[in-house]
Regions:
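Cys/His-rich short segments
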Residues: 1-32, 482
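Extended interfacial segments that mediate partner engagement and assembly in macromolecular machines
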Residues: 21-82
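Short, charged beta-turn/beta-strand-edge "cap" motif at the junction between a beta-strand
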Residues: 41-42, 94-105, 433-435
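Short nucleic-acid-contacting surface segments enriched for D/E, G, S/T with interspersed K/R
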Residues: 76-97
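OB-fold/S1-family single-stranded nucleic acid-binding modules
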Residues: 97-128
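Condensing-enzyme catalytic core mediating Claisen C-C bond formation in acyl metabolism
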Residues: 127-186, 286-342, 346, 435, ...
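Claisen-condensing/thiolase-fold acyl-transfer catalytic domains that form or cleave C-C bonds
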Residues: 129, 193, 219-220, 238-240, ...
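Phosphate/pyrophosphate-binding loops at sites that engage ATP/ADP/AMP, CoA/4′-phosphopantetheine
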Residues: 195-211, 349-365, 386, 421
């Protein structure tokens, strides 16, 4: 047979099959699919034992007038093997999710995991809206262009944690009511991708205009290997982006706001994506075990299509080791009662007062107040200490139902406010990070927010979603410690 001749004749079922066939990259990560066929792996291989009984399937996607089949598995799904009827899933719509696949020292991620379209997760892919909205109005002051928060589907009530630890549940009901936890294939990276995608869709921004991806976290699955690079690539942001992780406990993300706004104002960057993401850690039975949550929140900052301008900044820092984790230790340590008055309250209130002094404003000049939320009591007490009333601070307190999201906590509270805030309303935000420091900001809502209202996936819609699922303490610890 001579060079260039066809060795395998084309097969009838595919015009591109055979020696002369070709392959091309096709990305379905931002497309809805349908379950074509499925099976339950009752005895998974070692790599997938953590999922117990993976639900494998072929997902059908429309492409060029035909269909393409992609193999994957169903995620965020827990059911007894005896309860699963495969036939009921055929034809169901599914959404690609960026999740962990397996861990062999290197954690492997992909979008070959799918959640059911009508499950807990609302997706912008199901909305009849263009992903990019051109021609955002330039703003005199840079600020927030879009926002997005991600809270996992699974929850545990604080009573469940107390009973598992042999404690009286009544003693802990003032910490949080319930809290979010990851599924077995979720972590800080997957949370960050979800929040980033929501923020960019809400903004209607072209991914090619995102010049920075910054992720604040204290629960990166790796000691060395930044979360931000995974977010940028998974979200389709060009490789020319400046990607990096930031660290300062729970204010790791908010500490970037002023720096990013300054760079945007100077013309160095166009849009910057700042994300706070954490699978908050706590030693089993420790006081933190009652409050730690999971999830992420993201802001796209820029100078066009701004929904809230940044109009004031103040900071406060001191060498206060109220909360820390030594290198090589799995769980953080804390100073117990020392974390309150001497750390959180002194720092948050000082930063808040400094902001009011620098801007010449008073608590009565604000419509909303949000602070870092380690538990239900602290942010409310700090708000009152700064002169705020309940109708100003209550909306931003999401901790009651999702727990302390660490680096995502304060931003998630801000997202809850932006979900309902009206043009000209003013927001004061005071973040906190153990060690210790606070970032205080003034945001003023603009008319642009109304045009993006239908693009938001609201925080309350996730917190109170009727499809959220409650789990046992054993499942909670397993998901936390994966």
């Amino acid at each position: 047979m001579g060079c260039g001749e066809v060795y395998f004749p084309p097969k009838m079922f595919c015009n591109n099959e055979g020696r002369e066939s070709r392959m091309e990259d096709v990305f379905f990560g931002e497309s809805l699919g349908e379950i074509y066929t499925a099976s339950v792996n009752r005895h998974p291989t070692t790599k997938f034992e953590y999922l117990e009984a993976p639900f494998s399937m072929y997902v059908s996607f429309r492409a060029d007038g035909g269909r393409v089949m992609v193999s994957g598995r169903l995620t965020d799904f827990r059911a007894s093997l005896d309860e699963i009827g495969i036939g009921g899933f055929i034809g169901e719509g599914v959404v690609p999710r960026f999740r962990r696949v397996y861990d062999d020292g290197l954690i492997h991620y992909s979008r070959l995991s799918f959640s059911l379209l009508d499950d807990y997760y609302e997706t912008h892919l199901a909305r009849d809206l263009e992903p990019v909205v051109p021609g955002g109005t330039p703003s005199e002051r840079p600020g927030i262009v879009g926002y997005g928060a991600y809270v996992p589907k699974y929850r545990i009530r604080v009573e469940e944690v107390a009973e598992a630890s042999g404690k009286n549940p009544d003693l802990y009901r003032g910490v949080v009511k319930e809290k979010a936890l990851p599924f077995l294939d979720e972590d800080t990276r997957t949370f960050a991708v979800e929040a980033a995608e929501r923020a960019m869709f809400h903004a209607g921004a072209d991914k090619n205009t995102v010049d920075v991806v910054s992720v604040g976290t204290e629960s990166n699955p790796y000691a060395v290997y930044p979360v931000a690079v995974s977010v940028a690539e998974a979200c389709g942001i060009p490789s020319s982006v400046n990607s990096y992780d930031a660290r300062f406990a729970c204010k790791a993300a908010t500490s970037q706001f002023g720096l990013m706004i300054g760079a945007i104002q100077a013309g160095i960057y166009r849009n910057t994506l700042v994300i706070g993401s954490d699978n908050s850690q706590a030693r089993p039975g420790d006081a933190l075990d009652y409050s730690v949550g999971a999830g992420a929140a993201a802001l796209l900052l820029g100078g066009e299509g701004v929904i809230a301008t940044l109009d004031g900044v103040a900071h406060y820092s001191s060498d206060t080791p109220d909360f820390y984790r030594r290198e090589g230790e799995r769980y953080p340590s804390h100073g117990g009662r020392f974390t309150g008055e001497q750390a959180y309250f002194r720092t948050v209130v000082s930063a808040g007062k400094s902001l009011l002094e620098r801007t010449g404003l008073s608590s009565g000049d604000f419509d909303y107040f949000v602070a870092h939320q380690p538990n239900m009591k602290f942010p409310r007490s700090a708000a009152r200490a700064l002169g705020f009333e309940k109708d100003q601070y209550e909306l931003g307190n999401a901790v009651d139902y999702i727990g302390n999201m660490y680096a995502g906590s304060c931003i998630a509270g801000l997202c809850a406010i932006l979900d309902v805030a009206k043009p000209s309303e003013r927001i004061m935000m005071v973040a906190y990070g153990s060690g210790a420091g606070s970032d205080a900001y003034v945001f003023t809502v603009t008319d642009e927010i109304e045009g993006k209202r239908e693009r938001a996936i609201t925080l309350s819609g996730q917190i109170f979603n009727p499809r959220r699922e409650y789990v046992s303490y054993q499942f909670y610890r397993r998901a936390k410690d994966q």
